[in-house]
Amino acid sequence: MRGSVFGFVPSFRIRFFASSTHIIDTMKTLQEYLSASHAPEDLGKIIMMIADQAGPIRSAFISNQNYAGSTNSSGEDQAEMDTWADTRITSVLQESGLVRSIASEEQEDITEMSPSAKYSVVMDPLDGSSLIKVNLTVGTIVGIYEGDVLQAGNKLRAAFYMLYGPLTTLTISLGNGVSIFAMNEEGTYVLLKENVRIPEGTLCGSGGLRPEWTEKHIQYMNAIECEGGKNRYSGSFVADFHQILEYGGVYAYPATKKSASGKLRLVFEINPIGFLAVQAGGAVSNGESSTLEIVPTKVHQRTPVYVGSKGMIAKIEAIR
């Protein structure tokens, strides 16, 4: 049997998957999960509104595979899908009246929306968008704060990402563990796995060109390779992290000789993913201490990142 062309999973396949692997005992939708978690009503609505954009975003891949001829605030070329997904999600949140402000990797500044609203959203609308042309996995990364945008990652009320691969999945935490859902053929997110934990593993993926690595990072990667570490790096942060979440190991985008701040953005990428990692029993660090404790001073602030199994993160912090 096959899923639909958009990567949805027929509900009968999910039931078989759940019963045959004993991952879950009963079926639960994302909406039911939010209710059972006692998520505040407005927070739950914001999560569902963004989650519901996965189908339209994935459907738009076919007709939006080129570059848009523009750059984002970080100076990176924008793919058509970057701007399409950003506009789509921003418009939905603007119309809802439930969001105070939004910060997106594809927007130069924080966009103010409804001043009386309780929550603010940070997002990378389409992480890894350059991989769409070669049909590799990409995703949408989201964090939600109570109050304003520029807060430490440990203040997040919710973090999740949608992954557009063979399945369309949503991995989420409200601060009480991590759960993974998959979209079925009806567009409903059904629970695949709950209480997800990052095992100690040997997968490793590192960004940056090797000649530009610092001595500290070279020492770290050499040690991993000597211990049998297996390299996994696709160019999509969210896809590479999902492998680490499942199998254990570390994803790194370190400080380099050219950029002491690394490449990834603290607000849109590192904080939501780091929050999920910690909720799954893992850790996140800039190589010295937790990135979740950093209070950003600007929306496009960058920082080096190591995220994954606790043991892997302890090793990089131990190198002086």
From Swiss-Prot:
Catalytic activity: beta-D-fructose 1,6-bisphosphate + H2O = beta-D-fructose 6-phosphate + phosphate
Disulfide bonds: none
Keywords tagged on the record: Carbohydrate metabolism, Cytoplasm, Hydrolase, Magnesium, Metal-binding
Gene Ontology terms: cellular component: cytoplasm
GO MF annotation: an example: fructose 1,6-bisphosphate 1-phosphatase activity
Residues at which Mg(2+) 2 binds: D124, D127, E269
Coiled-coil features, chain-numbered ranges: none
Cofactor: Mg(2+)
Sequence positions that bind Mg(2+) 1: E105, D124, L126
Involved pathway(s): Carbohydrate biosynthesis; gluconeogenesis
Subunit: Homotetramer.
PANTHER family in the cross-refs: FRUCTOSE-1,6-BISPHOSPHATASE-RELATED, SEDOHEPTULOSE-1,7-BISPHOSPHATASE, CHLOROPLASTIC
Protein name: Fructose-1,6-bisphosphatase class 1
Gene name per UniProt: fbp
